[in-house]
């Protein structure tokens, strides 16, 4: 699924401040956003790091294109970390959500295995 958002920004607005205001995306933090982020910070024992952040570019012509980082790899000090998540809502069944994350991580693992064998 892809959503395209377009808009015009007042002159003099710093594009970095715009990005900081919209990320992490509400679809990954919950709503209301700031209360959800506070709860996540209090409940989760590990930082989400760049998970749920953005990757993209801001062009010299002030164009901007970004994607939300929901399935990610990080290679640091000879250690590869990969992450995925699920959308938990009031009617979620924890076991089903865990299975969904397992499937997503399985796809990342397969990508690693494919890269290693090629």
Regions found by a protein language model. Give the residues of each.
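Conserved hydrophobic core element of enzyme catalytic domains
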Residues: 1-118
């Amino acid at each position: 699924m892809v959503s395209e958002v377009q808009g015009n920004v007042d002159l003099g607005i710093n594009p970095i401040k715009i990005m900081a205001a919209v990320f992490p995306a509400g679809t990954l933090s919950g709503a209301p956003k700031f209360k959800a982020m506070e709860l996540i910070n209090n409940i989760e024992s590990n930082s989400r790091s760049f998970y749920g952040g953005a990757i993209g570019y801001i062009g010299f012509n002030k164009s901007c294109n970004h994607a939300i980082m929901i399935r990610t790899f990080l290679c640091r000090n000879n250690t590869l970390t990969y992450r995925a998540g699920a959308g938990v809502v009031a009617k979620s069944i924890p076991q089903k959500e865990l299975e969904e994350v397992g499937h997503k991580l399985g796809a990342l693992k397969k990508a690693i295995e494919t890269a290693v064998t090629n």
